[in-house]
Structures are given as C-alpha cells and as structure tokens.
From Swiss-Prot:
UniProt function note: Plays a role in virus cell tropism, and may be required for efficient virus replication in macrophages.
UniProt cross-references to Pfam families, sorted A to Z: v110
Main location: host cell
Similarity comment: family membership: Belongs to the asfivirus MGF 110 family.
Gene Ontology terms: cellular component: host cell membrane; membrane
Localization annotation: Host membrane
Residues glycosylated per entry: 68, 264
Stated name of the protein: Protein MGF 110-11L
Residue ranges of coiled coil: none
Presence of the UniProt keyword Glycoprotein in the record: yes
Species of provenance: African swine fever virus (isolate Warthog/Namibia/Wart80/1980) (ASFV)
Membrane topology: Multi-pass membrane protein
Entry keywords, A to Z: Glycoprotein, Host membrane, Membrane, Transmembrane, Transmembrane helix
Domain of life: Viruses
Amino acid sequence: MKVLLGLLLGYSVLILAHELPDLPRTQHPPKSELSYWCTYVPQCDFCWDCQDGICKNKITESRFIDSNHSIVNCRVFRDSKTQSCLYEISSKMPNHFNMECLHPRPYTGNEIFMRTWGGGDHQQLSIKQFCLYFIIGIAYTGCFVCALCKNLRLRTTMKLFILLSILVWLAQPVLNRPLSIFYTKQILPRTYTPPMRELEYWCTYGKHCDFCWDCKNGICKNKVLDDMPLIVQNDYISKCSITRFIDRCMYFIEPKIPYIHYMNCSLPTYFS
C-alpha cells in the first residue's frame, strides 16, 4: 500500500512539474486549440473559413460574413513557465490578455477591453487606462504636497480630495469607450442607412431605428422582426447612425444626444 501511495505521489509530482511546450507567437494556432482560442476571440481571422468571398466560423459553424469583413489579425502564444496563454489583436495596437490555458472560460464585453467571468484571470490595463491612472496619481500627490507646503487646514484638504475624487468618478465612462486615435481606418463610415444585407444585424440591436421599418399608408412594419407589432408611422421610431471600426460595431441614437452601444461585429446577440 505504501509503495502504491509512493508511486501515485511521484506520478502526481511529475504531472505538476511537466511544462507545456511553448507555442511560438503565430497567427495560426494548432487546429487542436482552435476551439480554445475562438471561444475567447471569435473575431480573429484564424477562426474563419473563407471561400468565394464568404466566411464561415470554424467553431460555431455559423455567422456567415463577407471575406475580411469584421475579421482582425490576431497572434497567440503560450508561456509554459507561467502556464498562461496570451493573444494580441493586431501588431499596431496590441491588446495583451492573459488567461489560464487549461481553464478556458466564456467571456462578456467587447474584445478590445475583454472581461471574463469568474476569478483567476488577469486583465491588462489599456493605454488610456494607464495614462488616466498615472495622471490621477500625479494629481493626488500634487494635492497632498500642496497641502503640506501651504499648511492648509484639514477641512480644505478634504474638500480638494473630494473634488478630485468626483472628477475621477466622472472620467470613468471614458474608459469604456474606444479612442479613435488607436484605429487606423474605418471599414464602414457613419451612416443612417446600412446596407440591406446588414439590416438583420443592426435591427437586432437597434430595432427602433427608422431604417428598420417599412412604412406604407401611415402604418409601419419591422423589416426584420416579424413578432414586432405594427405601429403608426414615426411612432417610437428614432433616428440612428451606425459605424463599424476594425474590430467592433456601434450605433448612435440621436446624434445631438448620442446613446452609444458597442457590440461585436462578428457575433450579434439580441440587445436587451
């Protein structure tokens, strides 16, 4: 019995000590790992099979899209020492995201600033997050030094810190929006009338946009959603403009007071 326990213990140590071979940085991971990578980054080009200008997802076997439409270049590699995987979205603006290679998890949120369910995942700060937090740190340090140098009262110092904290809180929504300077081009310019082939996609999200309705004799019917009830012309219909960046889509309701909604161009889901 002791010998058996010793063998099991030794075998366990060997398993734990075994390192996964390093996967070189590549744009084409092994086929055996496609299911893993495409769970996290379904918009990467290696997740799609394109023929005659039409692409089909290799894993989900659905979501037919035009060739090179909403597909971005990604690079992946595995670090055997840290037992973590990492992928990069484009070489011009890499987005590093570490995850446990043996425990893939489904994700939520957009792909540039990915957030995963559960613990154990480490999300790297984006460039603008790092810059903002760096500026915040300098501002707090400056307030503290200023309070010491000018020998300000505690009450005045607390007011300064509260004011600065309010400004930081107001700046938080900026972190969830992409900066246009990080993108080199736009695939689809902002427009009020998307192509006919994309109506099903856009009207899944912006079902109240005016381009989603076919109006005759003052009565309108939704072009995509058959279960939507008929409405009076221009009733509950708002103007929407749409745009697509290299890796994401967004639509705006009312240009003057925009309601911005980001989405994954290659994987539309119902907007709630």
